Amino acid sequence: MSGIGNKRAAGEPGTSMPPEKKTAVEDSGTTVETIKLGGVSSTEELDIRTLQSKNRKLAEMLDQRQAIEDELREHIEKLERRQATDDASLLIVNRYWSQFDENIRIILKRYDLDQGLGDLLTERKALVVPEPEPDSDSNQERKDDRERGDGQEPAFSFLATLASSSSEEMESQLQERVESSRRAVSQIVTVYDKLQEKVDLLSRKLNSGDNLIVEEAVQELNSFLAQENVRLQELTDLLQEKHHTMSQEFCKLQGKVETAESRVSVLESMIDDLQWDIDKIRKREQRLNRHLAEVLERVNSKGYKVYGAGSSLYGGTITINARKFEEMNAELEENKELAQNRHCELEKLRQDFEEVTTQNEKLKVELRSAVEEVVKETPEYRCMQSQFSVLYNESLQLKAHLDEARTLLHGTRGTHQRQVELIERDEVSLHKKLRTEVIQLEDTLAQVRKEYEMLRIEFEQTLAANEQAGPINREMRHLISSLQNHNHQLKGEVLRYKRKLREAQSDLNKTRLRSGSALLQSQSSTEDPKDEPTELKQDSEDLATHSSALKASQEDEVKSKRDEEERERERREKEREREREREKEKEREREKQKLKESEKERDSVKDKEKGKHDDGRKKEAEIIKQLKIELKKAQESQKEMKLLLDMYRSAPKEQRDKVQLMAAEKKSKAELEDLRQRLKDLEDKEKKENKKMADEDALRKIRAVEEQIEYLQKKLAMAKQEEEALLSEMDVTGQAFEDMQEQNIRLMQQLREKDDANFKLMSERIKSNQIHKLLKEEKEELADQVLTLKTQVDAQLQVVRKLEEKEHLLQSNIGTGEKELGLRTQALEMNKRKAMEAAQLADDLKAQLELAQKKLHDFQDEIVENSVTKEKDLFNFKRAQEDISRLRRKLETTKKPDNVPKCDEILMEEIKDYKARLTCPCCNMRKKDAVLTKCFHVFCFECVKTRYDTRQRKCPKCNAAFGANDFHRIYIG
C-alpha cells in the first residue's frame, strides 16, 4: 500500500540514473581501457585520435543508456499497471465493504426500537466522504469505527490512513474494521431475536381466550406498528433525499469528468508528438554516430593525415579540419540539450497526466459520496415534505374508508357465494339432463348405423345384378340409337320434300299470275302440263329416295353392330345425293329451255289475241277461284300437319319412329291424291280447250299437250308401280319395327322393374340419411343449448362481478365524497393561489436555471478550448525558441572571420547540402525515390510504404491525405 502515494518518488531515480552511468563510463574509458592510436605525427593529430576514441565510447555508452532507459521504462509501466490493478481491487473491496457497513447500519436503525431516528441523522453525516487529500489516490473512502460515536469529528479516508501507516498499524486497523462489522452483524441478530420474542408474546396473547389480554395485545401491536410505520417513513425520506443529492452531484461530477477526459486526451496527443520527436532525434543521433565511426575507421585503416588548417588533397591523403569536429561536437551537445528538454517535457506531461488521473479519481469519489444536507435546504424538498404530510393525512382517511369497504365486501361476498351455489346446482341438473339426452341420441345413432349397413349390403347386391344385365342393356341402347339415327334421316328427307313442295307451289303461283289474258289460257293449259310433269318427276324422285331410305334403315337394323358397313352406307348415300343433284340440274336446264320456247310462243300469240282480252279476264277470275280452293286445301293440310306434330310430341320415345313413318305415308298418299286431282283438272281443261279452239295453232298445241299427257300417264304408271313397291317395303319394315318394339317393350319393362328396385333402395337410403341428419341436428342443437347455458352462466357471473365492483366504487365514492367535500372546498382556494404563485416562481427559476446552465456549459467549453490552445501555443513557442537558438548559433559560426572556408570546403558543404536534399527527411538514411502525386513532396519509397501499411496515410510535411494510387517511384540520375 505504500506504493499508492509514492508514484513520484519511484519516478525520480529514473531521471537521475543515466547521468551517473555516464560519468562511470567516462571514468572507465579514461582510466581502464587502453587505446591504440597508431602512428601520430603531431599533438593535434593525437588530440583528434583521442577525441575520436572518446566519441566512439560515448556513443556506445549512449546506446547502453538508452537500452537501460527502455528497460526501466518498461519495468515502471509494468509496476504502474500492477499498482493500478491492486488499487482498483482495493477500491472495489473498500466500496463494497463500506456499502455493507452502511446497509447494516440502516437495518439496525430500521429494527432497533430503543434508538431514535436522530442517531441515524448523525450517523449519516459520518457516512459522507469529504474531498480527499492531494497526496491520496483513493476513489472511495470510509469512516472509522471511532467516527460512529462522534459525528462532528473530521472524517479521514480509510485508504489514505492505510497508505500512510505501517504494516503493523494496517493489520490492527483492518482487524478493528472486521471486528466492527462483526459487532454490527451480531447486533442485527440480537435485534431480530428481540423482534421474534415480541412477536411470539403477541401471538400468545392473541391466541389466549381472555378478551382483555387480546385487546391489550391488539393495542400493543397497533402502537408497535404505528411506531414502525413512522420510522419506516422517516427512513424512506432520508434515503430518497440521499438518492436525490447523489444524483445531482453525479451530474455535476460527470461534467467535470468529461472535461478532465478531454484534457487527458489532449495531453496524450501531446505526449505522442513529443515521443515521436524524441525518437526522430534518437535516430538522427544514431545515424551521426554511425557515420562518424565509419569515417574514423577509414582514417585509421588507410592512414590519412589530418592537418590543422590544410584543406587540399595530397597524393592519397585526406585532410580533415578540426573545426568540423568542433561543429560536430557542438551539434552533439545541442542534440543532447534537445533530448534533455524533451525528457523534461515528457516528465512534466507525465506529472500532469498523473495529476489529472488523481483529480479524476477524486471527482469520482466526490460523485459517489455527495453531500445530503443540501437537499433539505432546497425549496423542492420542502414542497415535497408538505405534499407528503398532506398525502399521509389522506392515506389515513383512505384507511378508514378501506375498513368500511371491507365490511361491505364481506357481506357482498356472502351473497355472491349463495348465488354461485344456486347457479352451480342448476348447472348440475342441466348437465344430468344433457347426459341422458346424449345417451338416447347415441342409441338412436347406433340403430341408424345398423340400418345403413343393411341398406348398403342390399345396394351392393343390386349393383351386382345390374352389372350382369349390363350387356343386354347396352345392346338395346345400341339398337335404339340406330333407330333414332334412322328416324333423324327420315325427318331430314321429309323436310327436303316440304321444301320442294313449297318451291313447286311458288312456281305454280308465278306461272298462273303470268297468264294475263284469255288468249294465253290455252298457253297456260299447255304450260301447266309442262310444269306438272316436272312436279311428277320430283315426286317420283322423292318416292324413290324414300324407298331407298327405308331400305337403308333395314340394313342399319341388321348391320348396326358393324361400323364399316355404316361408313359404306354413308358413302353410298352421299353418291346418291350427288346423282340426284345432277338430275335436278338437268331437269332445271330442260325447264328453262321449255320456258324460253313458251315465251317465244307467247310473244307470237300476243299480237294475234289482243282482241280477246275480255275472255282473258273471265279466265283470270276462274284461276283466282281455283287458287282460293288450293289455299283452303293447303290450310287444311297445315292443320293436319299441326295435329301430327302434336301427336308426335305427346307420343313417347318408343312410338315416335312409328308416328314418323305413318306421317310420311299419309303425306305421300296426300301428294298422290293431289297429283290425280291435277290430272283430272288438266283433262277437263283440255276438253274445254278442244271445244273452243279449232284453229291450226290450237290443234298443234293440243297435240303437244296430248303428248305431254301420254308422257305423264306413263310416269304415273311408273309412280304407281313404285308406290306399290314402297307400300310392300313399308309393310315389311312395319312388321320388323313392331317386332323390335315388342322386344323394346319387354326390355323396358325389365329396366323399369330394376329401376323401381333401385328407386326403393335409394328412397330407403335417403330416409336413413335424413334420419341421420335429423339426429345430428338435434345433437348440435343440444350442444348449442349447452353452450348458450354456459355463456349465460358466464354472463351472469360477469354481471355479478360488475355489480360488486360498482357497489365498491359507489360506496367508496360516497364515503370519500362526503368527507372530502368539506375539506376540499375550504382548501381549494388557498391551494389555487399557492399553486399559481408556485408555478410562476417555478417557471421563472427554471428559465433562470436553464440560462445559467447554458452559460456554464458555454464557459466550460471556452475554458477547455482556451486551455488546449494555450498548451498548443506554449508547445509551439518552445519549439520556436529552440529553433531560434539553433539558428543563432549557426549565425555566430558563420559570422566569425576565421571560419571563412576555402573552395573545397564550400564545395563539400554544397555536396552535403545536395546530399541532404536528396536524402529522405523521414528516415534521413535512404535516398528520395518516391513522390506523392497529391502534394508532390518527395520521400523514400520504404517510408511511404510503411506509412501506408501502418494507416498513417498523410504527408509528413503538409498532412495531405494520400491513397494506394497516389504515390510512385522516381529515379533521380
From Swiss-Prot:
Which parts of the sequence carry N6-acetyllysine?
Answer: 21, 348, 510
Matches recorded under CDD domains: RING-HC_RNF20
Positions of the region Disordered?
1-37, 128-153, 507-620
What keywords are assigned to this protein?
Acetylation, Chromatin regulator, Coiled coil, Metal-binding, Nucleus, Phosphoprotein, Transferase, Ubl conjugation pathway, Zinc, Zinc-finger
Q: Name one GO cellular component term.
A: nucleoplasm
Biological process (GO) annotations held by this record are: negative regulation of cell migration; positive regulation of transcription by RNA polymerase II; protein polyubiquitination; ubiquitin-dependent protein catabolic process
Q: Which Gene3D superfamilies match?
A: 1.20.1170.10, Zinc/RING finger domain, C3HC4 (zinc finger)
**Pathway the protein contributes to:** Protein modification; protein ubiquitination
Domain of life from the UniProt record: Eukaryota
Any one GO MF term held by the record is:
histone H2B C-terminal K residue ubiquitin ligase activity
Which cellular compartments is it found in?
Answer: Nucleus
* Catalysed reactions listed for this entry: S-ubiquitinyl-[E2 ubiquitin-conjugating enzyme]-L-cysteine + [acceptor protein]-L-lysine = [E2 ubiquitin-conjugating enzyme]-L-cysteine + N(6)-ubiquitinyl-[acceptor protein]-L-lysine
| Catalytic activity, EC | 2.3.2.27
Which family does the record claim for this protein? Answer: Belongs to the BRE1 family.
The molecule here is called E3 ubiquitin-protein ligase BRE1A
User: Quick one: which gene encodes this?
Assistant: Rnf20
